[in-house]
Amino acid sequence: IKCSWWTKRGEFGMWEGYGSCGFHTTDITYQGSFGILALFPNLQKKQMEMGAKFQRGDGRVHHFFTPDLSGVDDGYDRVDMNPQFVLLVCRDYLWTGDREYLARMWPHIEKAMDNTQLLDGDGDGLPDHDTRANTYDAWAMQGTPAYIASLWLAALKAAVRMAQDLGVQDRAAAWEALLEKGSKAFVEKLWNGRYFSLWA
């Protein structure tokens, strides 16, 4: 039994589960692609570049590829895909040291970050709009979920590092300020004195 596909066209993807679901799902790639990166870094980068081609004009990242790897589903509604995409690109860049890869992916990083920032309706630096659609699809989260907010803060930290490495200082400074504001709001909103609440 295999769950990976590498086409003659050079496309690569893995099923979310054996014989089911989509290929190269952003959320499952985020959770389970360390082995691919460690053993076949070029295949991992290829997956990410394939996904970047299908980034929507407003910055939203795809959920998964169709079985023939020629397109993506219409599921652009999951709000954790963008931060996961940014974190994956940063991880792959830091692991491989491939600055050309980072430069190719940079416009997609900017769009993904800008789109997620639009989900901050109250200006506290954390997403709070349309946060129900995410990887935990059976959980009815609302408002500012700790899961989404923590991914966003991690993506901000990663984006600052990538911006600095590319010499994009204005972006680095803006995201660093947002990271500081969001980190403060994360504790104020979600810490209940014993643990971080699921959402606030």
Residue ranges and their predicted role:
Residues C3-K8, G13, H24, Y30, ...:
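Catalytic cores of carbohydrate-active enzymes
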Residues C21-L126, T144-A163, E176:
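Aromatic-rich carbohydrate-recognition surfaces in CAZymes
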